[in-house]
Amino acid sequence: MGLDDVLARVAQAAEAAGREPADITLIAVSKVQPNVRVKAVLQAGHRVFGENKVQEAQGKWPDFRAAFAGVELHLLGPLQTNKIKPALELFDVIHSLDRDKLARKLADAAQARGACPPLFVQVNTGREPQKAGIDPDDLDAFIARCRDDYALPLAGLMVIPPVDDAPRPHFDALAEMAARNGLAGLSMGM
């Protein structure tokens, strides 16, 4: 399935859900993809990509950004506190804010840098012990701390539903949590 096919499916799903296709951003996940495949998608005109690891992104995206204007890069995977500085330099959006220690260190690094990309709070709606993310019961208080104590630019919420669950209930729950907290962005993957 090519990029045009994927974009057509996204547009059909948006229309079926009563949404505007233009309101949905497709993040092409480029983790572990060979550079030749990423380059082909860039040449096809797509500009929004996601990576799971800071180190992998550092190895491929500076050259792609030099060759292709308008690239927007999203960090989708866990962010270790020792990788905050390079993450802030490389990524346009971070989708994996999931704990107070990370929020505090992001705030400190962003203040020193003078800027912070938009952030999505990762929510563990399935309460899976092996997955990162804020427990839904702790979310509202965490968002308040991120706003009030750390002054972080929260853009929305992110979820990766459990593999064995139907995703719709997790997506619906995330949308309700985002609305309750005045967050417009929803990052719903896999």
Residue ranges and their predicted role:
Residues 1-190:
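Conserved alpha/beta-domain cores
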